[in-house]
Amino acid sequence: VTELAKYAKEKGIGLIPAINSPGHMDAMLVAMEKLGIANPQANFDKVSKTTMDLENQEAVGFTKALIGKYMDYFADKSKIFNYGTDEYANDATNAQGWYYLKWYGLYNKFADYSNSLAAMAKERGLQPMAFNDGFYYEDKDDAEFDKDVLISYWSKGWWGYNLASPQYLASKGYKFLNTNGDWYYI
């Protein structure tokens, strides 16, 4: 990665490193269990294979420490750090993870988690970036999110997956990087 970062700098190419959480954490969840962290997965209709339980403080602490190490590494190699936040527990909820977070009163925990990662990026001089999914789900102000986060807008949602519209997020002052998943393979 150091060699790639050096090459990119020589060519004037910006890198955007990404560590996706609290979803898409398959390998990290397996590693947590092997390291003795009990039940790091979200559990709704079934246990998620991809998403961390935001109420498991040991899992959250481990994840923040790991992401912090990557942020430290990239602080002098990149201007932006994408910390993910998309598709929360879709594998455990029939693609309704955000709905479940709201139903169980956990949506503010997600916002707090997202905001803490944004703060970590800013402390290191990095522009925080996150995918749009969980920000103001259903165009509602059920929680507050850091306004400095650059939104990587990848999906407008699909049936029953009611993501905030670009217009709604723009009205709140967010800036975007268009990463629309309909136009390329992610």
Q: How should these model regions be labeled?
A:
Residues Y88-D91, Q96-I186:
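Catalytic-core regions of glycoside hydrolase
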Residues V1-A130:
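Substrate-binding cleft of carbohydrate-active enzyme catalytic domains
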